[in-house]
């Protein structure tokens, strides 16, 4: 069975994608990854620490796909890690205009 990793770096990621993840689990083995680091550490530190944790998570298991939701700042290094490791990225809900957050 093909495997998908879903990095849920924000609590909203999992809640908004719950139905999609349930549907995907019918045909794929889905693993949800969440960082243990505190997002209050600042954008740069949070991104870096997420990337390190995610890389360590990927070292334990091979994945066929990575499902990346939205365009949050900490997902860029995570997507880069997937690209470096040859894991195809499925990117959803990206492309919204920036302005409210950073």
Where are these regions (language model features)?
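Active-site and donor-binding regions of nucleotide-sugar-utilizing enzymes
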Residues: 7-10, 14, 39-102
């Amino acid at each position: 069975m093909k495997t998908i990793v879903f990095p849920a770096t924000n609590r909203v990621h999992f809640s908004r994608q719950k139905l999609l993840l349930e549907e995907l689990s019918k045909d794929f083995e889905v693993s949800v990854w969440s960082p243990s680091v505190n997002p209050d550490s600042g954008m740069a530190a949070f991104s870096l620490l997420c990337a390190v944790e995610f890389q360590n998570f990927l070292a334990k298991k091979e994945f066929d796909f990575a499902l990346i939701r939205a365009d949050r700042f900490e997902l860029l290094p995570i997507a880069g890690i997937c690209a470096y490791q040859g894991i195809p990225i499925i990117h959803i809900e990206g492309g919204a205009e920036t302005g409210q957050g950073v």
